[in-house]
Amino acid sequence: MEQNIFDYLVEGLDLTAFYSFIDSKTDIDKNTPKLVFQYTTWSALFNGIIRSNEEDDKNVHVFSTNCQYLNDPKEVETGEQYVDMALNGFFGNSGECDDLRHRNAIFMTSFSENENSLPMWNMYGKNGNGVSIGFDLGLLRSHSGGTIKRCLYDTPLNRTLFQNTLSKERISEVENSGDKFQQYLMTLMDFAKKGCYEYEKEIRLTRQVIEAPEYRLSENFIVPYVDNVYPKEIVKKIIIGPCNDFDRSTKSLQGWLHKIGMDHVEVTYSMLPYRNN
C-alpha cells in the first residue's frame, strides 16, 4: 500500500484542537435539523426537481454543480486559504497542498437550515416569487453517495480560533494518521466559505465525480453538473414565497402534488414582510 506523504509530516504533532475545531463547525450530527431547504424558482421545482412524467414519477432530482461554477466564482479560494494556513502553521510551507487545489471533479449542492429567510428569498427565491423546498436530511444523507456537512464561515473570530489550533510543536508519544489529516484538509477545502454568507447557514453536499457530467445553460455560460436522484419521499415541505399570489399558488401547488402522488408534502406560505419593487 502506498504511504500517505502526510504520515511522516504529522508525526508527533498534537492535532486534537485542529480536528475538534473543524468538527465543531462542520459536523451535522450535533443539533441536526430534520429538514434542509433550497430556495428556487417555480420553473426549477416544476421542470427539474420534481417531474410529473410517467417515466419518472417516483423520483426527485437535485443537481450538484462543479465547484468551479458556483454562484460565487471564488468559492474554492476560501478553502484553499484555510488549507494553506494549516500547512504553513504545522509545517512552515504549503507545498503539499497542490493535489487538493486541483480537485476539479468536486460537485456541490447547497442547502440551508433557514426555511424562511428574507435575504435567501432575495438571493435565490426569485425576489420572493419562488419557493423554498424542505428536504428530509436523514434521507438525503442515506441516499447521497457523498459528504454532507455544515459550512465553516471565514469570520474574523473563526479565523482566529482556527489559527490558534496550529502549532509546530512535536510530542514524541503522539501517533497520527496521514490519511485522517488529509481528510480534514479536504473538509476545509470543500466546506470553508466566505464569512459574508454566514446568514445562509449552509449545509453542503459534496461529491467527487469520475464519470462525465451533464451540462446545462446558465445566464452566462454552460455549467457542468451531475443529477442526484432521490425518492420523492425526501421532499417534506414547500414554502411559497412571500410575493406570490397566496390563494392561487397554494391551490394549484396542492392540486399538482396530489396528481403526482405527493400528498405527504406540507404546503405553507411565507408571511415575511417583503417589498418587491
What does each of the following model-derived ranges do?
Residues 1-277:
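Partner-binding and oligomerization surfaces adjacent to conserved cores of proteins
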